[in-house]
Amino acid sequence: MARTPEPPLVPEAEQVYLDHLGIFVPDLPPVAESLGRLGFASTPFAKHGNAPSTEGAPAPSGTANICAMFRAGYLEVLGPTGEDTPLARQLADRLERHPGLHLIAFSVADSPAHRARLNDAGFDPVSLVRLRRTVPTPDGEASARFDVLRVPPATMPEGRIQLVTHHTPALVWQPRFLDHENGTQALTGALVCAEDVGESRARFGRVTGRDGGARARTLDLDRGRVDFVTPAQLSDALPEATVPALPFVAAAAFAVSEIAATRRLLKARGVDHLDTDDGRLIVSGDAALGASLVFHQSGTDPWS
């Protein structure tokens, strides 16, 4: 039987992907162990830097990450590195609000081309960032390169919302990091909780250039989706969930190859989780680094 082709890592032309979600933490060193307990393979610690306008080393951005990479999308965990920078201050401000998910990144083929559209939509995006991150490879270290276009925090209170263009996807999605004990294949969705669902969805639509769509509470993308719920509706998607602040990114969803195997792994490792009636597994709180992580069988709805 012919193998089903894997989805392309990055979008083409006018496509928009849900690229990755980011959890903010105050301290990165313990993260790899926490991800490993959940069954994720993690990338090594990597500091972020902004490419200089002239020759020289990248300027530290004040943050670093550890990631779990999937065949579609990834989960990023970010923490401070000690420098006093605008990005580090934003991370600290978000952590004071609540721990957990604070970043949604959408990937596009050409971030700079979206600047004029975002200006016209009233977002006044900050200057384009030429982000650099050193990554290990089997042949030594290399520099992963990204263009990142962020909108000002005041315009998107849900978190750090950005458009990213990958210039070196093969360095980011290295095959040795794509297999996970918990069977995760793809990042499939983000769940946003807001008082005014329609207004929040409309803003995300303007950021991504996807204003239309038949589903009023869902922003459908070429890969992945963002769903929106009110506080009163949150328990339908996340039973036992609490609301730390509004609006907020409530959960990340992951498709797994065999949900029963994921369930066995979590039980064997003593990871507290909710086994829902519709077959999803939800890990929240400290075990999920302050976030809510939803595992669902590949091909099923992440939020039910």
Language-model regions, residue ranges each:
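Membrane-anchoring hydrophobic segments
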Residues: 50-51, 60
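A short beta-strand-loop structural module common to alpha/beta enzyme folds
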Residues: 43-50
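Glyoxalase I/VOC metalloenzyme domain signal
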Residues: 1-19, 23-43, 59-130, 136-304
